[in-house]
């Protein structure tokens, strides 16, 4: 099986799931799969592999958390014991997922059920789709090319003047395969080093963090703030409601706010002095990262907060050269973190699949994001999107 542990996912799934257990245990949601570059040159069809994908999901749904895995989670300062107890009896249920081959040669994946019981599907299902696709289309993968490309990245990061630059692995969902993912991480650990003096800050993957002694990284994803559109008191206040609910859960811990659910301008309107002080920083995931960083720093200054005490996290389609450019622009002006995904874990010379699974409904109503990159928006209800734009004053 591709997925052999329920920890083989991103940390933010657990940090969000804990909020769901404590604050929104009754929420019902629906997620939908999309391949953003389907039909593009070099991208094959997924429909031929639909039975294999279903088989792997069946295997995923037979997994339980092991005692050592639960102990690892329990040792994290922000994970509460009642949540670990819940995970001790948890398993994913296949009835909440359907995978269908479409006449176009694409596939439809729908995940629908209680948020608490469906939140852990997204990352392993994406990793399954990716690995099934690549093991069928690249039966003899060019690992030599992959290693060469990784070596180039490492040498770029070790150039003069970049000693303080740290990167993190955010590549679970779109990795070429699990074995390759582990090799990449082991190589980075050996070559870049970890801890205070190393250049590898950690990984979003909880299983590999546990296995390799790395720091697991992550706070919140778009789905959390999107669900708040249906769970909060008023749509206009849903972003504030999301941040306040997060703060109620974590009391200042895990303080990185995601900034692009309604675009940067709406984020800055809501992210007032209170949130500037309370949260440790913000994460960039769409739009121009240089412009975003400058606006973020100016916003801190305007709210009488020293930007040097705050962290800017960049995680949008990063490559090593782009990471270095951003580091050079913002070094010394704030704390910095860089999460590199596909470019680390799926760069062997083959065209990667740009696949996502996004929440589209919560408690029966549409939810959406209006990110700073229009192609990243995903909602089936045009009327709702128009309403959202109006409410958040987006042009």
From Swiss-Prot:
| Alphabetical UniProt keywords | Ligase, Phosphoprotein, Pyridine nucleotide biosynthesis
Task: Look up the EC number in the record and give it.
Answer: 6.3.4.21
Q: What species is this protein from? A: Polaromonas sp. (strain JS666 / ATCC BAA-500)
Residues recorded with modification Phosphohistidine: 222
Q: Which HAMAP family match?
A: NAPRTase (MF_00570)
Q: What is this protein called?
A: Nicotinate phosphoribosyltransferase
Its cellular-component GO annotations read: cytosol
Give the protein's biological function: Catalyzes the synthesis of beta-nicotinate D-ribonucleotide from nicotinate and 5-phospho-D-ribose 1-phosphate at the expense of ATP.
GO annotation, biological process: NAD biosynthetic process via the salvage pathway
Q: Cell membrane: present as a keyword of the record?
A: no
């Amino acid at each position: 099986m591709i997925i052999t542990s329920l920890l083989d996912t991103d940390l933010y799934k657990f940090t969000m799931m804990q909020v769901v257990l404590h604050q929104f245990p009754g929420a019902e949601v629906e997620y939908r799969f999309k391949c953003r570059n389907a039909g593009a040159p070099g991208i094959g069809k997924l429909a031929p592999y639909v039975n294999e994908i279903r088989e792997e999901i069946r295997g995923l749904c037979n997994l339980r958390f092991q005692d050592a895995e639960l102990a690892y989670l329990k040792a994290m300062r922000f994970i509460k014991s009642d949540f670990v107890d819940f995970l001790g009896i948890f398993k994913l249920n296949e009835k909440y997922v359907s995978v269908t081959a479409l006449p176009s040669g694409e596939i439809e994946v729908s995940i629908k059920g209680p948020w608490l019981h469906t939140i852990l599907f997204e990352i392993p299902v994406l990793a399954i789709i990716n690995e099934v696709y690549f093991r069928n289309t690249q039966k003899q993968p060019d690992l030599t090319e992959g290693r060469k490309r990784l070596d180039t990245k490492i040498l770029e990061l070790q150039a003069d003047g970049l000693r303080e630059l740290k990167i993190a692995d955010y590549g679970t969902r779109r990795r070429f395969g699990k074995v390759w993912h582990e090799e990449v991480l082991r190589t980075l650990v050996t070559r870049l080093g970890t801890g205070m003096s190393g250049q590898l800050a950690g990984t979003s993957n909880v299983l590999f963090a546990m296995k390799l002694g790395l720091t697991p990284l992550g706070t919140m994803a778009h789905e959390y703030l999107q669900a708040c559109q249906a769970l909060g008191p008023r749509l206009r206040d849903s972003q504030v409601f999301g941040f306040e609910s997060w703060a109620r859960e974590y009391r200042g811990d895990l303080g990185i706010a995601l900034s692009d659910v309604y675009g940067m301008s709406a984020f800055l309107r809501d992210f007032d002095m209170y949130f500037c002080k309370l949260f440790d920083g913000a994460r960039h995931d769409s739009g121009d990262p240089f412009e975003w960083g400058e606006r973020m720093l100016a916003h801190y200054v305007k709210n009488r907060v020293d930007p040097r005490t705050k962290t800017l996290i960049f995680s949008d389609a990063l490559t090593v050269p782009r990471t270095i450019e951003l580091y050079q622009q913002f070094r010394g002006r704030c704390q910095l973190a860089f999460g590199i995904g596909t470019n680390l874990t799926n760069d062997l010379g083959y065209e990667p699949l740009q696949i996502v699974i996004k929440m589209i409904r919560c408690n029966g109503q549409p939810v959406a994001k209006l990110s700073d990159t229009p192609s990243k928006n995903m909602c089936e209800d045009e009327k709702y999107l128009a309403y959202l734009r109006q409410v958040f004053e987006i042009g």
